């Protein structure tokens, strides 16, 4: 198999999994290797198998956010690796990080990096923009100290000595 063919096969595996997530599939095992690992940023945690992924990520996300529309913006592939950045449009209809449901529509920005082995996803490194979600729900995790204030001209950025 050529490198380009391998890349296209990897992309097909990842897109099929993304479609299954978007369709609320409960049969995700056909997309993941038996040794699957899901490694998220702070607040997301690490899931060491498909059962942990389902119980500690997929179902809590469904409980907190309904009317989800998955919108992958771009896929990049390189052999057995694929990456995607995008967002999920959703309604905050269940408790999230201690915040009671607000029924606000939010954007959940994410970036994923997947490794595909033998036609199955074995590793998934994930970054979900929790500070942005929380800000949309009225919680400023930076307590007014976010560097966006520099961009808006509201604060002077520090300079190195």
For the regions a language model picked out, list residue spans one by one.
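A solvent-exposed, acidic/Ser-Thr-rich amphipathic alpha-helical stretch
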Residues: 26-81, 87-89
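Beta-strand elements of well-folded, non-transmembrane domains
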Residues: 22, 90-92, 116
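Short, solvent-exposed aromatic-acidic interface loops
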Residues: 125-134
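A short acidic/glycine-rich loop-to-helix N-cap element
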Residues: 99-101, 134-139
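Short, low-complexity N-terminal intrinsically disordered segments enriched in polar/charged residues
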Residues: 1-30, 34, 144, 149-161
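Short, structured motif recognition centered on aromatic/hydrophobic residues
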Residues: 10-18, 38, 57-61, 82, ...
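A cross-kingdom feature marking solvent-exposed beta-strand/loop segments within repeated
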Residues: 42-45, 91-109
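Hydrophobic/aromatic beta-strand elements that line small-molecule binding cavities or substrate pockets
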Residues: 71-75, 109-114
